[in-house]
From Swiss-Prot:
GO terms for molecular function: ATP binding; glutaminyl-tRNA synthase (glutamine-hydrolyzing) activity. Heterotrimer of A, B and C subunits. It catalyses: L-glutamyl-tRNA(Gln) + L-glutamine + ATP + H2O = L-glutaminyl-tRNA(Gln) + L-glutamate + ADP + phosphate + H(+). This is Glutamyl-tRNA(Gln) amidotransferase subunit A. It holds the Pfam family Amidase.
């Protein structure tokens, strides 16, 4: 049989359902692949071999008993190490949580288990999801399977690199300012940020609570849609969860795969027309626009004048919320504890713990956020940023009165060499230039491969109105039907 790691998730689910391959065989093939290549890629922080095989055996037993199986039963999935997994390490890429094993599953993980997917393990990430390259992980960087000397994007580079390395057919990420879509773009995979509130944040280690959004990652648009359908939907344990059904993203992906976009009106954001983007990225984007036009879409230019303020607004809102959220990591209740010698005061222990446990990027953002929220500065910084956020949301609302979806490059540049930007935080922050607006608005966004620049993947971003996730899946699948899924060089 063909190497099982080369199949899509939809194909693997079909093999298992028909009894042409067992879930154990599928799982073992991916575990073997991880053993063979992950010492070079470093996509995983923890591989739960026994747990994965036990879950696979359960699927095989249920099939043998004639029980109905879900659409992804027996399919392996990797989970970004920012979602709690009962009894399995959850570090958020930080030294401060290095030995923490949560006593409960996040809602996303619970739904994955209920659907019969097989969790392979936890993937590497920038510490507390703060970064754009997965170089800020306390456990070392992840490498891009397209070129191991380059970054896989961030913060969820591990989830996307694992897909590109064929270590898993599916993975879960979280997107606060582009942390699913940007890694997807630079690894040639599909990354989806659902509508905020469309996927549960219960059990997600919080970075910026008004922005954090868990979502699916895959190698094909249909696979991402199938995973989206499994993890999405209302959750009473999350106060920000939208009490509405998941849009019919699977049907939309299948419709788009026909390659017909007749009647679809797409908007190119004028303010994103080339600012800060590499020539190769722009060339791939313009070629994708031509392809979408040939598929029947009408492409027009729209203006979103406040998008230029999205990056500075984000870097006030997100650090402000993270400075509050990360206050819980103090060495008192769980995680790392430093200096508890019976002599130091509680305040000294807390300070020593945070000094030793947090990395430089986390400290930078906590300090920035604390300042922005401090007395006398709150209105000038955090308050003003929230007003800008409202203006950006109005830009989206106005734009979506004219078009069905917006398109742009996902990132301004292709994957850069490891270490090339760590000395300049601002250059690192520019990686999310095109993705941040949809986080501030709360609407969905997807990155789908659209071409190559200098032999490296380029992603097209499709943004849609809130709870219209199906629209972006249709457009992305249509482009994929022409461009096709990308295959990196052999490792």
């Amino acid at each position: 049989m063909t190497d099982l790691t080369s199949f899509s998730a939809a194909e693997l689910a079909g093999l298992v359902a028909r009894g042409e391959s067992s879930a154990v065989e599928v799982t073992q093939a991916h575990l073997d692949r991880i053993s063979a290549v992950d010492d070079r890629v470093h996509a995983f922080l923890h591989v739960d071999t026994e747990g994965a095989l036990d879950a696979a055996r359960d699927v095989d037993s249920r099939r043998a008993a004639g029980e109905p199986l879900g659409p992804l039963a027996g399919v392996p999935v990797a989970v970004k190490d920012v979602l709690t997994t009962k009894g399995v390490p959850t570090t958020a890429g930080s030294k401060i949580l290095a030995d923490w094993r949560p006593p409960y599953d996040s809602t996303i993980v619970r739904r994955l288990r209920a659907a019969g997917t097989v969790m392979l393990g936890k993937t590497n990430m920038d510490e507390f999801a703060m970064g754009s390259s997965t170089e800020y992980s306390a456990f070392g960087p992840t490498h891009n399977p397209w070129d191991l000397s380059r970054i896989p994007g961030g913060s969820g580079g591990g989830s996307s690199a694992a897909l590109a390395a064929y270590e898993t057919p599916l993975s879960i990420g979280s997107d606060t300012g582009g942390s699913i879509r940007q890694p997807g773009a630079v690894t040639g995979t599909v990354g989806v940020k659902p509508t905020y509130g469309g996927t549960s944040r219960y059990g997600l280690v919080a970075f910026s609570s008004s922005l954090d959004t868990p979502g699916p990652c895959a190698r094909t648009v249909l696979d991402a849609a199938l995973l989206h359908e499994v993890i999405g939907g209302h959750d009473p344990l999350d106060s920000t969860s939208i009490p509405a059904p998941v849009p019919d993203v699977v049907a939309a992906a299948r419709l788009g795969a026909s390659g017909d976009l007749t009647g679809v009106r797409l908007g190119v954001v004028r303010e994103f027309a080339g600012e800060g983007a590499e020539p190769g990225v722009l060339a791939a984007f313009h070629a994708a626009v031509e392809t979408l036009t040939k598929l029947g879409a009408e492409v027009v230019e729209v203006s979103c004048p406040h998008f230029q303020y999205a990056l500075p607004a984000y870097y006030l809102i997100a650090p402000s919320e993270c400075s509050s959220n990360l206050a819980r990591f103090d060495g008192v209740r769980f995680g790392l504890r430093v200096g508890d010698d019976g002599i130091r005061s509680l305040e000294e222990v807390m300070s020593a713990t945070r000094e030793a446990g947090f990395g430089p990027e986390v400290k930078r953002r906590v300090m920035l956020g604390t300042y922005a929220l401090s007395s006398g500065y709150y209105d000038a910084y955090y308050g003003q940023a929230q007003k800008v956020r409202t203006l950006i949301s109005r830009d989206f609302t106005t734009a979506f009165e004219q078009v069905d979806a917006l398109i742009s490059p996902t990132t301004p540049f292709v994957a850069f060499p490891v270490g090339a930007r760590t000395a300049d935080p601002y250059q690192m922050y520019l990686a999310d230039l095109f993705t941040i607006p949809s986080n501030l608005y709360g609407g969905p966004g997807i990155s789908v491969p659209c071409g190559l620049a200098d032999g490296l993947p380029v992603g097209l971003q499709v943004m849609a109105p809130t709870m219209a996730d199906d629209r972006m899946y249709r457009v992305a699948a249509a482009l994929e039907s022409v461009v096709g899924p990308f295959t990196p060089p052999a490792l």
